Curated annotation (Swiss-Prot):
Protein name: Elongation factor Tu
Residues that hold Mg(2+) according to the record: T26
Region (G2): 60-64
Protein keywords: Cytoplasm, Elongation factor, GTP-binding, Hydrolase, Magnesium, Metal-binding, Nucleotide-binding, Protein biosynthesis
Entries under CDD domains matching the protein: EF_Tu, EFTU_II, EFTU_III
Organism for this UniProt entry: Mycoplasmopsis agalactiae (strain NCTC 10123 / CIP 59.7 / PG2) (Mycoplasma agalactiae)
PROSITE patterns: G_TR_1 (PS00301), G_TR_2 (PS51722)
Recorded family membership: Belongs to the TRAFAC class translation factor GTPase superfamily. Classic translation factor GTPase family. EF-Tu/EF-1A subfamily.
Function: GTP hydrolase that promotes the GTP-dependent binding of aminoacyl-tRNA to the A-site of ribosomes during protein biosynthesis.
Gene it is expressed from: tuf
GO terms under cellular component: cytosol
Amino acid sequence: MAKLDFDRSKEHVNIGTIGHVDHGKTTLTAAIATVLAKKGLSEAKSYDAIDNAPEEKARGITINTSHIEYNTEKRHYAHVDCPGHADYIKNMITGAAQMDGSILVVAATDGAMPQTKEHVLLAKQVGVPKMVVFLNKCDMIKPEDAEMIDLVEMEVRELLTKYGFDGDNTPFVRGSALQALQGKPEYEENILELMNAVDTWIETPVKDFEKPFLMAVEDVFTISGRGTVATGRVERGRLSLNEEVEIVGLKPTKKTVVTGIEMFRKNLKEAQAGDNAGLLLRGVERSAIERGQVLAKPGSIVPHAEFEAAIYALTKEEGGRHTPFFVNYKPQFYFRTTDVTGGLEFEKGREFVQPGENVNLKVKLIAPIAVEEGTKFSIREGGRTVGYGSVTKILK
């Protein structure tokens, strides 16, 4: 485990880049780290260092979610670079779930594309409160075509408003991530302008410190001689070293003790809401815990398989189904970090749900997971999101 202590003197905010494939999300992430490094606030990162999974290179599309950290004068940021390709939206959902705000990257040469819309919708669905927009590749627009950038901005503002964001007041910054990464001063200035907008527009999240501890498990690995480590984002509460937690969902609930806490390879005495932490668990076999479970304060949350929910079925244009679904439909329900198959029961008199409809229905999962009223989820089939919802009432 790590040896350094983690600095809590600055506000900590989780953000990430979202947007259409090849619009420049990873280049922008590298540019932010590199420009801030010149001010001594970050470590410079190359594009390749962020775009780091081997399978990404083969296809030239980002698959895994990369985590980097940097500072502005005001804050410490943990930044996730989210995958852009539709096939990898499942990863995007786990990535977007870790955002207190996001930077939407839109190429001025293209404007809003299908995945731009899908990511804005997903951001809303997973509870990202605000975003800042970076209009990228502005260096590729000829001066005489400058009004094209204005049109793209108008279009994206309308899109934000449509999906429930503040389209009128959201800050837009124009620039070129590639030129900034290559050290062109006027484009580096745009990156500082962008980070200033992020510092001011994206609010420091109200940390849920007072609520009982809960962390969704994203990944599990073994440290030889030490034991099993579960990683994820602390959704709420605080956890001190040597405190008890329960492993909840999918399997029978099990108690354990947390004997180590780390964040960005630095040791912590406690983990708190908003942290991306690794927890060392006493006496837990690697096979006894899996992605999709949660670690929670004992007794604070119990697993459920049946609940009522309000759902929205995406339209064909939003990437949803082209046809209605009927009562025998058995999609996957994506909660926090995992898919669980479930069946549906419609309200009396309803025979099907059309794309674009908002309905209330009952869900029965094949395995119980940690849910409560207000828990958000998405409905997926064959690797694509076809709807989303919120738990309105626990049944059993």
